[in-house]
């Protein structure tokens, strides 16, 4: 288990404030926060690439001090893929992965490379030079190379940043397979909460230098006490009913004669569903998901999860 205790870090201003975090093998933990929240710095501290101002790091119960000298990526079974990862552009996909385990016996090394090519869907481009493949394929090669030496933990900084929706879905599957097949603990940083909802076992939110407790994906999605935080994970409606302010997700409603009346304005087809833009009688805009466009005027009843 990677465990961080009382971690604080400042540059010109405090970035991380007395944080606690832990991730076990076989767990995918998502770290979500806005750009500039300190997520990348926290990931580097986990990897031993940066010292905190204060705090302690434990790997499988063993305290690591000083961090940067002892906690070298790979040395304690930790691998990291930064946002600005680099491949050898003139080596093939297979060679880029193979170079990470040149110290392995040949037969074992060859078997491992073949497994990773298959796991990450890279068989078709295995002999292609790295600079000739797509950004999504390069991302998968970088992750395959990072885990080639069978690290116990994998740290990923914004792995979905330059991928389209289809490739994001495929990468999510590869990471879940990695967790399930090799019992790898994964910490995944993202500023887009929707990227981690269907992937992570637990999610923590980094905001104003503080790290939240671990939430399940369902709990964090339907937790509205902090609307700004909730909006990190998808559209959130806010309307006034009588004297109460009500928050609800676009899927938390039914068509009902007993509900409030809304007027249809526009609709976008997104991911197999229509995102309907409607307005309430108080002229508040509301987003509603449906399998079809809503008609001009409907009554909706909010059903809280």
Over which residues does each language-model region extend?
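ABC ATPase NBD coupling module
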Residues: 64-79, 103, 220
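Conserved ABC ATPase "signature" region
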Residues: 108-125, 177
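A short, proline-enriched helix->beta-strand linker immediately N-terminal to the Walker B motif
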Residues: 148-152
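Conserved ABC ATPase signature
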Residues: 129-133, 137
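Helix-to-loop junction immediately C-terminal to a conserved catalytic motif
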Residues: 47
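Non-catalytic connector elements of ABC transporters
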Residues: 245-305
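ABC-type ATPase nucleotide-binding domains, specifically the catalytic core motifs of the NBD
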Residues: 68, 86, 91-110, 119
């Amino acid at each position: 288990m990677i465990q961080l205790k009382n971690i604080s870090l400042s540059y010109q201003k405090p970035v991380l404030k007395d944080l606690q975090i832990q991730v076990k093998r076989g767990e995918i933990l998502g770290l979500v926060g806005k750009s500039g929240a300190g997520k990348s710095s926290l990931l580097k501290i986990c990897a031993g690439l940066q010292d905190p101002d204060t705090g302690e790091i434990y790997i499988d119960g063993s305290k690591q001090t000083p961090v940067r000298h002892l906690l070298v990526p790979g040395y304690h079974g930790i691998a990291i893929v930064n946002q600005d990862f680099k491949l050898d552009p003139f080596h093939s996909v297979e060679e880029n992965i193979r170079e990470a385990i040149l110290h392995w016996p040949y037969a074992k090394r060859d078997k491992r490379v073949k497994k990773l090519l298959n796991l990450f869907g890279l068989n078709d481009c295995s002999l292609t030079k790295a600079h000739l493949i797509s950004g999504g394929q390069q991302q998968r090669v970088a992750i395959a190379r990072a885990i080639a030496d069978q690290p116990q933990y994998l740290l990923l900084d914004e792995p979905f940043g330059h991928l389209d929706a289809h490739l994001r879905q495929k990468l999510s599957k590869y990471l879940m397979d990695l967790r399930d097949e090799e019992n790898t603990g994964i910490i995944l940083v993202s500023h887009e909460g929707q990227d981690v909802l269907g992937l992570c076992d637990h999610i923590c939110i980094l905001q104003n230098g503080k790290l939240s407790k671990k939430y399940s994906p369902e709990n964090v999605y339907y937790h509205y006490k902090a609307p700004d935080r909730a909006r990190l994970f998808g559209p959130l409606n806010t309307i006034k009913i009588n004297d109460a302010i009500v928050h609800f997700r676009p899927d938390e409603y039914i068509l009902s004669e007993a509900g409030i009346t809304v007027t249809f304005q526009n609709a976008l087809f997104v991911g197999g569903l229509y995102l309907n833009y409607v307005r309430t009688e108080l002229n508040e805009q509301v987003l509603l998901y449906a399998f079809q466009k809503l008609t001009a005027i409907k009554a909706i009843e909010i059903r809280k999860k």
